[in-house]
Amino acid sequence: MGQALSIKSCDFHAAENNEEHYTKAISSQHLTLRRGQSFTITLNFRAPTHTFLSALKKVALIAQTGEQPSKINKTQAIFPISSLGDQKGWSAAVEERDAQHWTVSVTTPVDAVIGHYSLLLQVSGKKQYPLGQFTLLFNPWNRDDAVFLQNEAERTEYVLNQNGFIYLGTADCIQEEPWDFGQFEKDVMDLSLKLLSMDKQVKDWNQPAHVARVVGALLHALKKKSVLPISQTQAAQEGALLYKRRGSVPILRQWLTGQGRAVYETQAWVSAAVACTVLRCLGIPARVVTTFDSAQGTVGSLLVDEYYNEEGLQNGEGQRGHIWVFQTSVECWMNRPDLSQGYGGWQILHPRAPNGAGVLGSCSLVPVRAVKEGELQLDPAVPELFAAVNASCVVWKCCEDGKLELTNSNRKDVGNCISTKVVGSDRCEDITQNYKYPAGSLQEKEVLEKVQKERLKLGKDNGMCPPSCEPWDPLHMFFEASSSIPLSGDGQLSVTLINPTDEEKKVHLVIGAQALYYNGVLAAGLWSKKQLFMLKPNQVMRLSTNLSFSCFEQTPPENSFLRVTAMARYSHTSLSCFAQENMAIGKPDLIIEMPKRAAQYRPLTVSVRMHNSLEAPMQNCIISIFGRGLIHREKRYGLGSLWPGSSLHTQFQFTPTHLGLQRLTVEVDCDMFQNLTGYRSVLVVAPEVSV
């Protein structure tokens, strides 16, 4: 090197810096930083620096990212190493020095482009020495970052927590699904940035709104390409771990590399969880939200059609959308300087069909407040999102002669139960009030009137309330059903009929049951029952019946729900009364016993018990246990068969390796069902701390 100033090595102090930047869970070897926050490096020179005084005055650092780094697009920065640092832009200041070592504090801008960076040392404006690579992420801890979150508990939950829940089931029977987001798994950051690299507008990667929309659009496209149809699901049902849905990382690997876990049509709700993983990994606070009884495919219409045959079973889909049992979405937190004041905070990531406007045209980012206030003009996706939680359902009866008859339906309104995980707790939180005003309130009335006027102005109004079908000779019907039915067991149904007139009525009653998937798609017709009776003047009649698996024409498919319906008509009119309820299918209880605290590197025993309350044997039982920081790899054990009325009791031992709150998940699969899951959390402490 002659007499030129040269670098021997550079110490990035990855472990220490990552600790300060809340990224130690990602890596202790690779420097991973959050923007707008300083970090420390040590430059080790080959010779004493005092012999190169003239060169020292021209020493600078270069930070660059992307395929074609440029100052113009903010993907390259050249900044001097001085004794003073600039807290607003890229800067470097010497903190300590001796003959051959400099300790330098480097500060990144709070609006820097995120991604993988190279850091170089430049001497005299010419010679450059590569120092190494680092990764820059968004910073919810920095008040000036657009993703700043004020509350530390919320930052911990929405950025750092790798364990969560997705809420499935029905509005009356919410079922928690333990979910491993795994945003800090070793390859997730690289996979997330690989996904982002499909967008060539690297200069816009400093804007969380842009990044979130890109993530939403690209994941949606990958899902469309990768999700397998139900027919393939059924054909491959005997294949390996078909219905496993334990976490985001295997799915993300499959979508981006082809090596991971496939997703099937009946599980496509997992895409929200995968998006949540990527956003949290990149430093954008995110959470998965479930809307029960959600109107989908409405194109903004506030009326949804459903069609049922004379047996009370669903008969195709309406032209104005349909009602999903539940729908999952992902919200992310950020300021929105591109919108009017007041629209920052939680934003809904809403992928949609491409419209020719590039990748961003395939995904909207809609403020939750805009949905609540019915601001249809704010974003093209607002009308559809508003309808998802405010639409009304119109039920039609398809007669044998091909005619359609409007029913007098008491179908519940949609979007009255919206849930997510409570911060710092394993409980479920109802956040419906974020999306809509209380039913019957003055605010709700004002918003609905505003939306109706806006739709009229746009020429899209088709009415906001279901058409009236009150008969001159009425019959009233009320339908009650259990919120869930045990697998292979019975559920209770009751129909109350009221004749408010002075004339006797001959009533035809049909009760039906069918299996459907979470997205409202019919899976199978299962059962129907007809009754004919006379209802006396002013009589109230209550009819009860058992809904039994033993009466079903076939076993409901995995991941399906039951929709039970009641349809009544009487002789003097063709008008039918209609009511329906969705029922979750309950599985046996899984009881897990484990200490709440455990010592790191010391064996821990867990006990698992399960009772077969079904009327049939549970054959080919397989139990799986897994948990990051607790078990190195998933453990699977064959347990044979469990006969009706008998119980299973087994124990496992493992050695925790990671400190902090960890989650153990236990899963049982058999010929009767898949994905019977339970979990327990354990606080792992250092060995010297008393347990």
Curated annotation (Swiss-Prot):
Matches recorded under SMART domains: TGc
Region (Band 3 binding): 31-39
Gene3D superfamilies: Immunoglobulins, Transglutaminase-like
GO biological process, one term: hemoglobin metabolic process
Phosphotyrosine modifications at: 570
GO MF assignments: protein-glutamine gamma-glutamyltransferase activity
GO cellular component, as recorded: ankyrin-1 complex; cortical cytoskeleton; membrane; plasma membrane
Membrane protein topology class: Lipid-anchor
Keyword Membrane applies: yes
Keyword Cell membrane part of the UniProt annotation: yes
Residues modified to Phosphoserine: 248
Misc. comment: The substitution of an Ala for a Cys in the active site may be responsible for the lack of transglutaminase activity of band 4.2.
Assembly, per entry: Component of the ankyrin-1 complex in the erythrocyte, composed of ANK1, RHCE, RHAG, SLC4A1, EPB42, GYPA, GYPB and AQP1. Interacts with SLC4A1 (via the cytoplasmic domain); this interaction is mediated by the SLC4A1 Band 3-I dimer. Interacts with ANK1 (via ANK 1-13 repeats). Interacts with AQP1 (via the C-terminal).
Function: Component of the ankyrin-1 complex, a multiprotein complex involved in the stability and shape of the erythrocyte membrane.
Family label: Belongs to the transglutaminase superfamily. Transglutaminase family.
Official protein name in the record: Protein 4.2
Phylogenetic lineage: Eukaryota, Metazoa, Chordata, Craniata, Vertebrata
Primary gene name: Epb42
